[in-house]
Every structure is written in structure tokens, then in C-alpha cells.
Amino acid sequence: MTDNNPTRCGYVAIVGRPNVGKSTLLNHILGQKLAITSRKPQTTRHNMLGIKTEGDVQAIYVDTPGMHKANDKALNRYMNRNASAALKDVDVVIFVVDRTKWTDEDQLVLERVQYVTGPLIIAVNKTDRMEEKAELIPHLQWLQEQLPNAEVMPISAQQGHNLDALEAQIAKHLPENDHFFPEDQITDRSSRFLAAELVREKIMRQLGAELPYQITVEIEEFKQQGHVLHIHALILVERDGQKKIIIGDKGERIKRIGSEARKDMEVLFDSKVMLNLWVKVKGGWSDDERALRSLGYGDL
């Protein structure tokens, strides 16, 4: 700490509807892949911390599941509760919206963030895709009218446009505090959790429209032996048909899933990785609160 630059540290919640670019934003800010992404809604299921320390400032980002209307299964209720809980006890809230459309789920998030009493920034994403920037002005003005106390900033999470300005604005709002985490720590999540998420990401990207949402991944073994990290991952589905989809014809799809996940793991863990995948049917797990707790989904 210097006289001109007090040490600042605080929590920053990133909220918004599903598939609006929250995890992409976090990854770009951190400068590395931490949160999984795909084009499918509800990719993020858990709140996860992404920690960025730069000089005197430590910003602790809370990446959240997309707030959505579906509340019929225990898993949906868990994700919505996690996202709403992130609005409490944070120092700054980033409400991510897509400049191309406004949905009922955006409105749902707006109705929740309007009660935020601390600093609120509306990050209008995907503005790099606009040919005429003047077309954006009415949308920015409308957002400002909806949340008069918020700061509205156009960004591109994918391209990194205006993220330096966003981070500077966040830093201004963080309280003067000693840093809560070591300078080199980037998340609160375990390596096993990150490995499971990478496998789930590759499943979501491989399956596309065939994707059964009732999929989760459990790491059964995570062991470093010499220069090789051995990881055994169990993919849980709810029906036999889902198992067949993931395995694919002659096992080709699950081989691709494993190959792509392994490559990302080797970068993340800086080690050669031996990855083994299995698929198991566990009927009804996504609506079974006891099963969800045993799979690490916390309080329901």
C-alpha cells in the first residue's frame, strides 16, 4: 500500500440470465479459462470465485448460474437460489445483458437487482457486433431509465472491448481492505471440481441439440503419479438413451469428449493427464435433493 493507492479488496457478483456471457466475461478478466462456457443455457450451475489481484487491488468475482424461470426440479431451484444469494454481501454487482435482445428472464433479473443498495453496473455485452454504434444509444438510455442508480457500460466479453474501463470502475467501488487471498490464487474451487467442469463443458459442446440437461460429472480419482495426473471421471445421466447419446457410435463421441477435456486439463494443471471416463445411469438425480447434496450441490 502507498499513500496514493490504498489496498482495496472486495466481492463482485456477476449476474444475468442464462447464456448472456457471464462466464466468458470472467475468463477474459482473469486472462485464463476458469469458468466453463457453451452456447447452451444453464451451463454454469454453481457459484464460483474468480480472483484477480493487480497491484493494490484484489477483485473477487462471483460467477453465478443464470437466473431463469424454470423452477420445477431441485437442480433448477438450487441454481436460482445460488444466483440470488450472490446479490447479498457483495461490494459490487455486475448485471450482464445482451444488447441484441431483452427476454422475460432479463426482466426477472432486473426486478431482483433493482433492490441492490450498493454499486451496480450494467454491462451491455456483444456490442462489438454492431455496425452502427449509434443504434446502441436508445437501448443504453432505456436501461438507465430502468435502473437510474446504475452505471451503464457497453462491453464485449468475447473480444475484451472496454473491459479495462469496466475493471477500473469496479476497482473504484471496492472498499479499502487487506487482500483476502494470496496474490497467485485464482479461485476457491478445488482441482477436482475444475476437472469435472471441464468434462461437463465438452459434453455440452459435443452434444448440441441432443444435450440432455440431466448430466453431471463426479471425479472418482484424482492422483498425481510421477509426471502423470490420473483422473477418473464418472458421467451421470438419468436414462439409458442419454447414456447411448454420450457414448456415441462405437464410442466415438465419448472419445472426443475425453480428448478435448484432457487437452484443457493439461493446460490448467500444467501436467500430462491420463483421463478415463465412464457413463452411469442414475434415474431422477436432478430432482433428488439427497442425491444432489451427495454430488456437491450444497444446500437446497
Curated annotation (Swiss-Prot):
Q: Topology with regard to the membrane?
A: Peripheral membrane protein
Q: Name one GO molecular function term.
A: ribosomal small subunit binding
**Which intervals of the chain are annotated as region G2?**
42-46
Principal localization? cytoplasm
A single GO cellular-component term on record: plasma membrane
Keywords associated with the record: Cell inner membrane, Cell membrane, Cytoplasm, GTP-binding, Membrane, Nucleotide-binding, Ribosome biogenesis, RNA-binding, rRNA-binding
Q: Where does the Era-type G domain start and stop, copy by copy?
A: 8-176
Region listing for G5, in residue ranges: 155-157
| Annotated localization | Cytoplasm; Cell inner membrane
User: What does the entry give for GO biological process?
Assistant: ribosomal small subunit assembly
UniProt-listed Pfam families: KH_2, MMR_HSR1
Q: Which residues bind GTP?
A: 16-23, 63-67, 125-128
User: KH type-2 domain location, by residue?
Assistant: 199-283
Question: Positions of the region G4?
Answer: 125-128
Q: Where is this region: G1?
A: 16-23
* Subunit comment: Monomer.
Per its UniProt record, what NCBIfam families does this chain match? era, PRK00089.1, small_GTP
Per the record, the similarity remark reads: Belongs to the TRAFAC class TrmE-Era-EngA-EngB-Septin-like GTPase superfamily. Era GTPase family.
UniProt xrefs under PANTHER family? GTPASE ERA, GTPASE ERA, MITOCHONDRIAL
> What is this protein's function per UniProt?
An essential GTPase that binds both GDP and GTP, with rapid nucleotide exchange. Plays a role in 16S rRNA processing and 30S ribosomal subunit biogenesis and possibly also in cell cycle regulation and energy metabolism.
User: What protein is this chain from?
Assistant: GTPase Era
Q: What is the primary gene name for this protein?
A: era
